[in-house]
């Protein structure tokens, strides 16, 4: 029994320290399971990495007319900021779910000063044909949508653990 505990503890210790922390947006940090590839395509910033069990990615998308919104936001009350964020996040999550054709578990969250949504659903993995878990945290950050998503490649407990570790590693300044 002690050997099993030692192995589990060692594995957990190693997996925690093999994480790669990145600042994905001004003041928002996340720990990727491996060093992610960074790219910018059509103004969308993306970080992506894959393990044997999961694909982890982050996308940062500017709000249309972002500069005008940032000027107007200076005069918004906290209630008005929340109202704008909620409206934008509601529309964003509805579009994502409509394009996937799935129903999801959606719950409001707040990370630091940023409003967001936690989204969880199942979908068919096109590579394997297996139904696997997908989970996202979408934050409204300075007139940007920051989508932090993890797609499990299989239904193993290790895949679910990697997904949860990734999504729970989000920190803000």
At which residue positions do the language-model features occur?
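Bacterial Sec-dependent N-terminal signal peptides
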Residues: 1-21
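Short acidic/polar alpha-helix capping motifs at helix-coil junctions
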Residues: 12, 66-71, 97-102
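Signature of long, low-cysteine stretches enriched in small and polar/charged residues
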Residues: 20-25, 29-35, 41-46, 85-137
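Short, well-structured beta-strand
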Residues: 48-69, 105-173
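Secretory pathway targeting signatures of secreted, lumenal, and periplasmic proteins
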Residues: 31-80
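Generic detector of N-terminal low-structure segments
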Residues: 13-15, 78, 142
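Extracytoplasmic/periplasmic, Sec-exported soluble proteins
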Residues: 76, 80-84, 155-162
């Amino acid at each position: 029994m002690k050997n099993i505990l030692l192995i589990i503890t060692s594995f957990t210790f190693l997996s925690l320290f093999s994480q790669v922390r990145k600042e994905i947006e001004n003041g928002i940090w996340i720990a990727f399971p491996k060093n992610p590839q960074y790219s910018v395509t059509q103004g969308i910033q993306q970080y992506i990495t894959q393990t044997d069990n999961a694909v982890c990615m982050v996308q940062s998308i500017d709000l249309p007319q972002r500069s005008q919104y940032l000027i107007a936001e200076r005069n918004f009350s906290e209630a008005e900021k929340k109202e704008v964020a909620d409206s934008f996040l509601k529309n964003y999550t509805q579009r994502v779910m409509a394009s996937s054709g799935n129903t999801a578990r959606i719950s409001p969250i707040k990370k630091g000063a940023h409003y967001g949504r936690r989204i969880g659903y199942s979908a068919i993995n096109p590579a394997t044909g297996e139904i696997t878990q997908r989970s996202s945290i979408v934050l409204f950050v300075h007139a940007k949508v920051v989508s932090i998503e993890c797609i499990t490649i299989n239904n193993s407990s290790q895949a679910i653990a990697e997904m949860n570790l990734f999504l729970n590693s989000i920190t803000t300044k």
